Amino acid sequence: MAETGSVHATRFEAAVKVIQSLPKNGSFQPTNEMMLKFYSFYKQATQGPCNIPRPGFWDPIGRYKWDAWSALGDMSKEEAMIAYVEEMKKILESMPMTDKVEELLQVIGPFYEIVEDKKNRGSGLTSDLSNVMNSTPNIKAVNGKAESSDSGAESEEEGLREEEEKELQQNVKDCKSPKTESLAAKDLENSVANDCYKDSFIPDMQNGIQTKSALNGLNVEEEIKKTEPSLEIANNCDHRGANEENTEEVSGTQHLTSDSDSEVYCDSMEQLGLEEPLEIITSAKGSLKRSSHFLDVDHRLQLENTDLPRHACTTAGNLQLGTAVDGAVQEKGEVKCGGEDGKASNGAPHKEKKDGEKADFYGVRRGRGHRLHPVGDGSQGGQMGNGGDGERWGSDRGPRGSLNEQIAVVLMRLQEDMQNVLQRLHMLEAVTASQARSATLQSNYQPASSVKKPSWWPFEISPGVLAFAIVWPFIAQWLVHVYLQRKRRKLN
């Protein structure tokens, strides 16, 4: 018992030192109720029960202290010490760490053991798990459960993958069905009628999808209607495949179908880079419809001038539309009628050149946010004409240069607007300051002027001056009279 009492006394003394060392203006300020508790427990632990009389009404603080102390009744000193330390434990975490607090923590020890014991007694499941972990066979069983759960998760993932593969296969079958082909043909006819093309039309043209009919003697619109359903089918299949990144890229730019959309208000460089090929393709389709007879003439010139076999020429004619669109997408590269590259490899077959273009555009398609690189080495933009008449189609302006110019123009206009706003602001400030000064001056001088000269006074001089001028002669006469009377009295 003596050892227990000494432990409680030591803890109590350490807690009292902590309370006494608290600064008056420190970060931790205990409440009045808390200080009353500490006071009552301290008095009970040091002096015992309260035996002094209650203070008078003139000492309200003493009365509160006496009430708190006397409320403890016959509590023993040891119990008061324990209660004092327990109250200290409640606020110990919120107190700043000082030397006294460290000393108290060393004396008290790990006072969270009660929570740990209660947790261990209340949770039988935790003890069971600890027993399982301590025994070797149970560890194997647990590992087996873990492995089975992992294998179950893997089987679920495999099932999801199989479902995705089945969906992809079903999408491919749907793409091959004639119903989908008819729907794609209708969508593509509508897009051709509106001169609007999706951005995914460009890489699909480069993936080797070729038409099987020559352009000799056929109308361009009929050829487009015949060739583009297969392109739209491949486009839909490609978008339903694993290339989700390109799907998001195309869906984000499908609304850019008008030339009136300004590049200044685009959200990103990627959107700007995708807007240029759309404008080029739109203008290219219009020129293709307007100059169908140029296609026939140039195709006959190609058959006469080339040294390739006839089936190679036919293949070149079939590739005419795809190569023309290739040239429209290119920033640099000269394309003439008939799908013939103006400055490509000398006498090389069109099939080899087509493969090279496919590789380049495939790389462009895989990269997001990059500009389309030229395939040909021509110094001018895309051209289309009859033998060299230089009929322009597409856009010759550099997208990056035009973007920089537009940004510069916008910045200049913004600076001008800001200067105008600043000038107007300075003018308003000056007018406000002048009005304030005039109002102050009027308020200062108005009372004086009202005293000197009222608004109803018809004369220029003030009423006071006029009254003084009238009264002054009488006053002067009276003073002279008084002076003369005194002088007479002195003489007498």
UniProtKB/Swiss-Prot annotation:
Acyl-CoA binding protein which acts as the peroxisome receptor for pexophagy but is dispensable for aggrephagy and nonselective autophagy. Binds medium- and long-chain acyl-CoA esters. Residues 8-97 form the ACB domain. One of its GO terms (cellular component) is cytoplasm. Residues 141-162, 335-399 are annotated as: Disordered. It is a single-pass membrane protein. Belongs to the ATG37 family. Residues 405-431 form a coiled coil. It is found in: Peroxisome membrane. SUPFAM superfamilies: Acyl-CoA binding protein. It holds the Pfam family ACBP. An acyl-CoA binds at residues 19-28, 39-43, 65, 84. GO terms for molecular function: fatty-acyl-CoA binding. The keyword Transferase does not apply. GO terms for biological process: fatty acid metabolic process; pexophagy. Residues 335-360, 389-399 have a biased composition (Basic and acidic residues). The chain crosses the membrane at residues 464-484. This is Acyl-CoA-binding domain-containing protein 5. Residues 378-388 have a biased composition (Gly residues). Residues 153-162 have a biased composition (Acidic residues). Keywords: Autophagy, Coiled coil, Lipid-binding, Membrane, Peroxisome, Transmembrane, Transmembrane helix, Transport.
